[in-house]
């Protein structure tokens, strides 16, 4: 079922410390649900092995990123781990125009800025099952130097501390379970009365029929 048949599209923010698994979860949700579209972010960092420009990120030079920021092309942007990351307004508009929820995997800074501009956004924090597991995931990244690893650990601590700012927290102990939990959150949020504007006329029609039945009794 497409979102157009259910209600009004809304932004969905997935945040997690580096190595928290938010990108894997986002890909699964987009692959399994036709009411979700992915907003590809921009970054100035170098691509990791296997990453593809336009699918994982739009990889920009610092100069190109700054030019886009000056033009007001970003809905939000932030500096994370020494690199710039940003969400393009046109990416958000593209997904909304297709009648789908806009799914974004962005950091805590970006989530704060985006939520100011889009207060209807649903924020979900992906929490690792333990600090030890997160450290193992970070250590497995071949692109991590010792200095970069230490920076990511410090930043991860600060990001986990911000989890209380989110409407939902999902522990990513097992990918299938985490994806299922977030899918349930999307279904529940989509069924909220204030998001079902498309059903207003149907609600009024049911009330009218019941009123007529009572009046005719």
What are these regions (language model features)?
Residues 1-12, 34:
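Extreme N-terminal, non-catalytic leader segments
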Residues 15-17:
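P-loop (Walker A) phosphate-binding loop of NTP-binding proteins
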Residues 22:
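Conserved lysine of the Walker
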Residues 25-26:
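Post-Walker A alpha-helix
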Residues 31-39:
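Post-Walker A helix-loop "phosphate-sensing" segment adjacent to the P-loop in P-loop NTPases
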Residues 41-102, 108-112:
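ATP-dependent small-molecule kinase phosphotransfer cores
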Residues 102-107, 117-140, 171-172:
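Conserved phosphate-donor/acceptor-positioning beta-strand/loop module used by diverse small-molecule
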Residues 161-217:
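NTP-dependent small-molecule kinase module
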